[in-house]
């Protein structure tokens, strides 16, 4: 998204469980040290491949700097994903991994607004529908957090005008 600001060199990654048709899905999210959302990745399974895909997707944009530190919780999928990403050259070899739960508190709090909307919707019936809907939630959440270059954080009128302009809606 070319409307966003640049990011800092500390990245936090976490996953959240979303119920889809009585089964579960996992949505991986990455934020920087100032709680700006970098990217998210939906996955049917919680695995190292999904965590690696999030990392590759988050670092694919040249406007995102290579992180010096990646904070994650103690999930077993992250060390393998980070090791493979370093081997493939997606991630610098000097990047540190800090698997400490409390360092992800900002990200856990950031999940709250998305999870609140999911609970209000009473969960999803199909994975594709969940992916598209949560993608919309994430974009609106970015706009509300002030991550869009031309829209201030508390300016609701400007946020509405921006959404109307981007989606071509009548005002």
Q: Can you say where each PLM-predicted feature lies in the sequence?
A:
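Residue-level recognition of single "structural anchor" positions
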Residues: 1-171
């Amino acid at each position: 998204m070319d409307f966003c600001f640049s990011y800092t060199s500390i990245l936090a990654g976490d996953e959240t469980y979303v119920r889809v048709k009585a089964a579960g899905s996992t949505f991986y999210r990455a934020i920087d040290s100032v709680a700006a959302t970098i990217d998210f990745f939906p996955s049917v399974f919680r695995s190292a491949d999904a965590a690696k895909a999030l990392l590759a997707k988050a670092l694919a944009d040249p406007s995102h700097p290579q992180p010096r530190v990646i904070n994650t919780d103690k999930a077993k999928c992250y060390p393998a994903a980070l090791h493979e990403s370093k081997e493939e050259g997606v991630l610098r070899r000097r990047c540190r991994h800090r698997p400490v739960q409390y360092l992800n508190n900002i990200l856990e709090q950031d999940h709250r607004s998305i999870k609140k909307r999911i609970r209000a919707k009473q969960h999803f019936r199909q994975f594709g529908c969940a992916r598209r809907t949560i993608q919309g939630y994430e974009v609106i959440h970015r706009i509300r957090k002030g991550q869009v270059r031309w829209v201030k954080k508390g300016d609701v009128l400007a946020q509405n005008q921006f959404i109307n302009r981007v989606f071509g809606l009548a005002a």
